[in-house]
Amino acid sequence: MSNLFSPAEVLRVLNGFNPWWAHRRVTVPEFRRTIYDACRKHLTQEHAETVLLLSGIRGAGTSTLLLQLAQDLVASGTDPRSVLYLSVEHPMFGMLPLAEILRIYREMIHPLDRHAVLLLDELHYAKEWDSQVKELLYGDNDYRIIATESVQMIERALVTETQVGRWASIAVPSLSFYEYLKLRGLDPGADGATPELEDLFTMKEDGLAAVAGALKPLVAHFPHYLTGGGLPGLATAADTSAGSSLFHEDAAERILRRAIARHFAARNVEDLKRLFLYLCVHSGEIFRVQRYAQALGVSPSTVANHVELLERCFLVRRVPPSGPGGTDVQKARNRVFVADATLRNMPLLRDPEGLGDPEERRTVVATAMLRHVAGRYARGLERITYWRDARGRGEIDAVVWGDGRPVVFTLTADSIKPFGFGDPVVDFCRREKVARAYLVSSDNRPALGVARFPGVETSFLRIPAHVLCYFLGRAECEVWKSGPAA
């Protein structure tokens, strides 16, 4: 296959991807995602791992991030020819072994004996990517590498086949509400006036009222975030519906048809597209595999496999139920969430006006809340489950189990109503010795408030969804300031 293209032809394409070699600037957004600093640190610190892998949904901004890194490295004095950006998804590069492309780069642009930065976009599209990644990890070179993948393949291979310390990984989620506000220059807490989320449990009413007042401007921006603010490319658009059809085509065709069909040999991509659309409509509900399989006329094992494929493409997230103490439940039925509210709403062509319907708003807010809870605890060993009362009297949307006492997040129909003994949520918190419970409202009416009950160790915080998402997103950003984790 390498004989199809001469080195000169390959070099022309490389030059197109790397305009800084000819001292030309590349146009990139000024906004830097939170993980940018961790990536820059990987490229500049000594004794770093050879490869940093960025894994996440298409459209989360990983390609832009690589180009921002390239531009900033060159601007800071790095030899332009020592910075190679490569979109492995390009048809020519997908047909050539990565080693052959790097050979041309070394012979015609930058010698092997000099330090180089490799920015490899969509590396899983590389020909024989598994052996090529091993060569990068163990080969005799002076490369510092950042690679991206929008299908969870490389990370799984690295976990099982390589040594700890040679690589690190970062999960790149969609924009949090906090990042969305920063992107639009709207952060009301930039002056340090707002406390940490956990501090709210110990504040008095006047302090909570002050926090609520400081964050009141967020109310107007939350609907736009829920319907189209999770992706950097759409977050700044005044009308997200303009990008809905484009995103739907990108998600359905490029992710489902191209990525899954190529990497997992899925035989019927149309079934995958139907399943994803069904999960968008029913995001956060318990997914009954048998019922769906019967309706579609396929086997339950096929449906279960398709859900796993969607999860490996970062389109959905499965949340299992939990038994006492966070134990596993036999024959568990998972709740399946679309990974982000924007991913859910774009294919359905939803707009902010649709949030006036209570059921629609609850579905969207539950999806956004789970994204923020998962993002906040993404770097730890915490496990996220849901809980349902055996008698069907109540449920908890997310329980975070870690080394310490569990933390609860649950949407409530009306956060103002009095809770007490006999309420299933309170009883669960008492039995499991929950540290903190967030009673989240999907509307903006309830004020911040703390409740406690005799004999229950848990502190309960009534909090509107937009305030919770702001604080969780900010905490998520703070975690990433410490750098990547292997």
Q: Which role does the model predict for each range below?
A:
Residues M1-P29, H47-T50, S55, T64-L65, ...:
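A cross-kingdom feature that marks ATP-driven nucleic-acid transaction machinery
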Residues T27-L43:
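N-terminal pre-P-loop "Q-motif" helix
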Residues G61:
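Conserved glycine(s) of the Walker
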Residues R144-S150, A171:
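Structural recognition of the conserved hydrophobic beta-strand(s) that form the central parallel beta-sheet
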Residues M153-S169, L181-L186:
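Short regulatory helix/loop adjacent to the ATP-binding pocket of P-loop NTPases
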Residues L84-D113:
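Short glycine-rich substrate-engagement loop in P-loop NTPases that contacts/grips substrate
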Residues R58:
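The conserved Walker
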